[in-house]
Amino acid sequence: SGSTTVKLVVVDEKSQILYTNYQPNLGNPLPLIREQLLKIYQEHPGLQVASVTTTGYGEELVKNAFRCDYGLVETVAHFTAAKYFMPDVDFIIDIGGQDMKCFKIEDGAISNIFLNEACSSGCGSFLQTFAQALGYDVKKFAALGLFADRPVDLGSRCTVFMNSSVKQAQKDGASIENISAGLSISVVKNALYKVIRASSPEELGRKIVVQGGTFYNV
């Protein structure tokens, strides 16, 4: 259970996915999770659950509410997943709903963690806020950015200041496509300049894995 969404996945003993669900948590994830658990058992009536693990911002809340077997720290969950798909991963970037995390991997372990500043600028809720303000669903809004011909330079400031920049861009006649692309570029800039702060690409590593729902939109 993350800051803005809830994700559930059921895998079998061969790590094959049997069921997945991804949805906004609406500020109260427990009823949504309960609904999905009931649906899982309805679709797989003979299902024998070996164990249940929770992670994310709602790790302890969900674990205690549903008496789950294990709780896994989010950073370890990110690393474990990345290593499963790329055993020699040496850098992980996660952009979630309200935070951004980067992990440096050395000798098979997390050696350093970089976090965004207190402001949630550059995360999923950042894009969603502007999409809704402009009257668009976030998926459609992000897709419009693919048709930009002159992305607006919005920098990498916090949401409050970015809002004034977007309004000014609209007054200057910028299209929705160019505003969308500009906001997506600002997410990338935020990661590079305020979180990673690498002086060269080589500092990131050679095997990089990206995670988090925001990557669907940038």
Which positions does each model-derived feature cover?
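Short glycine-rich, Thr/Ser-proximal phosphate-binding strand/loop in the N-terminal lobe
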Residues: 1-39, 112-113, 117-119
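Adenine-nucleotide phosphate-binding core of ATP-dependent small-molecule kinases
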Residues: 164-194
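Short beta-strand-loop/turn "lid" adjacent to the catalytic site in phosphate-handling enzymes
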Residues: 22-25, 41-75, 104, 111-112
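Gly/Thr-rich phosphate-binding beta-strand-loop-beta motif of the actin/hexokinase/Hsp70
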Residues: 1-14, 89-106
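Phosphate/pyrophosphate-binding loops at sites that engage ATP/ADP/AMP, CoA/4′-phosphopantetheine
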Residues: 37-50, 191-204
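Glycine-rich phosphate-binding loop plus the immediately following alpha-helix
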Residues: 28-29, 107-150
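Glycine-rich phosphate-binding loops at beta-strand->alpha-helix junctions
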Residues: 58, 186, 199-218
